[in-house]
Amino acid sequence: MKMSREQYAELFGPTTGDKVRLGDTDLWIEVEKDFTNYGEEMIFGGGKTIRDGMGQNGRITGKDGALDLVITNAVILDYTGIVKADIGVKDGRIVGVGKSGNPDIMDGVDPYMIIGAGTEVISGEGKIVTAGGVDTHIHFICPQQMEVALSSGVTTLLGGGTGPATGSKATTCTSGAWYMSRMLEAAEEFPINVGFLGKGNASDKAPLIEQVEAGAIGLKLHEDWGSTPSAIKACMEAADEADIQVAIHTDTINEAGFLENTLDAIGDRVIHTYHIEGAGGGHAPDIMKLASYANILPSSTTPTIPYTVNTMDEHLDMMMVCHHLDSKVPEDVAFSHSRIRAATIAAEDILHDIGAISMTSSDSQAMGRVGEVIIRTWQVADKMKKQRGALSGENGNDNVRAKRYIAKYTINPAVTHGLSHEVGSVEKGKLADLVLWDPVFFGVKPELVLKGGMIARAQMGDPNASIPTPEPVFMRQMYASYGKANRNTSITFMSQAGIANGVPEKLGLEKMISPVRNIRKLSKLDMKLNDAMPNIQVDPKTYQVFADGEELACQPVSYVPLGQRYFLF
């Protein structure tokens, strides 16, 4: 039997060589491989193939290995590739990406992907599946952020804070062992993975180690607490001892030292640099040069990406609010103006496109928007395609660019903070934190968000309707968000020292606990598809940015995709 590509795509979703548009962007991904055996596709429904004795094995039990969940015929967009496959989930983890079904009557079925009577089905035909996002720059200012992040497709939040305290509104620190304990307790209620950063600003290691032993997954150095060379050195030494990450927001006004002094204090040790673009803070005007170094893992945040005609005006007022500044004080106004530089903000987009900035993150409620990491990442990708054209290695599709950009908010932040053994990609063995998208809504509004293999958020219609689809349809909480289900579908990340110190037992934590690990030997070469290290220079007078001698300049845009048309109602 033969059918046209169009007919096949309508029935079973795209196959090898077919292209899918991402939302209303100009980005098109092409399926590189299809794991399906043509004619043996797994489809659920009346008269379809997942029935007893057909695609569903009638003998296998859950104990024998039958899947708990199969997502059928999905296009998977991951840093590892763009493929069409079934995804098998067992005990909340991905056990296979390939061909599911009944090996009694089918060839090529993955032995770990057998469908049985105990298997639930999510139809992925015509859908895109991505890994849940990992946001590494969270100010934990209000718990409602969790709902917004999860609804956007982000399933892991890392950062610091204790609520709308003045310190937390400005810095991503959960300061001290007592607050660390209380935030770990609060995290029990959230159907999302979390990890908390302690305050790293101390010239002695003792108060830093105390926070790590209380469960902090890392330490945050912030200029508002004094990112001095002595504090940096002590923090780096504590991190080396505990195998944790350090995130740094450097000294904007160069009060305790210049960029070179910070580099000397860091040495050759790995560190995650927030706000590599400088608008969110950091050595003015040349913080961007840090993206040249092998031990620097750079990220930037949603406020400045992509560069638009409104970016500059928006930032000055945001700066005043977020960093407890006063518009009546000339020095505070000068402080704000020193950060907001059009030339460096423009260069940020290009550095993302060449893979020199490795990660994107939100800076939630502290200049950034927690629900827009994914949207803005893809807006940058679209802007760069329109302004810079295809990337090397692309032939009629945008696969190289798509894989580079999705890595920025999935695998790379997971690697940076020692979580990649659990989350960050659609790979065997990882927690089934998966996001299903209708291609027309890609990047904006997920259809389903799975946590640990269970649906936590979904586009759902009127609960009193006779079917699930009548209006109003919007993102609603699902069963993984209720009761004790979230304890078995979400992870609280913790330092190895905190786990060894018995923190989960002392606090009576019921959520899954996982240690961060394998951090201190990382380098930028570990940043998937985003490991470029050009020689970056910034003109101190004009703020022009150069990479390997080439000026990085682009124009602001007045229109972005994935924007207003999706939020009319």
Swiss-Prot record:
Stretches assigned to the Urease domain: 132-569
Alphabetical list of Gene3D superfamilies matching this protein: Metal-dependent hydrolases (3.20.20.140), Urease, subunit C, domain 1 (2.30.40.10)
GO cellular component terms, semicolon-separated: cytoplasm
Catalytic residues (positions): H323
A molecular function (GO) term: urease activity
Binding site for Ni(2+) 1: H137, H139, K220, D363
Pathway note: Nitrogen metabolism; urea degradation; CO(2) and NH(3) from urea (urease route): step 1/1
GO biological process per UniProt: urea catabolic process
Protein modification: Carboxylation allows a single lysine to coordinate two nickel ions.
Positions with a binding annotation for Ni(2+) 2: K220, H249, H275
Catalytic reaction list: urea + 2 H2O + H(+) = hydrogencarbonate + 2 NH4(+)
InterPro entries tied to this protein: Amidohydro-rel, Metal-dep_hydrolase_composite, Metal_Hydrolase, Urease_alpha_N_dom, Urease_alpha_subunit, Urease_AS, Urease_asu, Urease_asu_c
Organism superkingdom: Bacteria
Cofactor: Ni cation
Positions of post-translational N6-carboxylysine modification: K220
EC number: 3.5.1.5
EC class (word): hydrolase
Major localisation: cytoplasm
Cofactor binding note from Swiss-Prot or TrEMBL: Binds 2 nickel ions per subunit.
Positions that bind substrate: H222
Subcellular location: Cytoplasm
Keywords: Cytoplasm, Hydrolase, Metal-binding, Nickel
Record-stated family: Belongs to the metallo-dependent hydrolases superfamily. Urease alpha subunit family.
Cited PANTHER family: UREASE (PTHR43440:SF1)
Subunit composition and interactions: Heterotrimer of UreA (gamma), UreB (beta) and UreC (alpha) subunits. Three heterotrimers associate to form the active enzyme.
Name of the molecule in the record: Urease subunit alpha
Organism, as annotated: Bacillus velezensis (strain DSM 23117 / BGSC 10A6 / LMG 26770 / FZB42) (Bacillus amyloliquefaciens subsp. plantarum)
Gene name in the database record: ureC
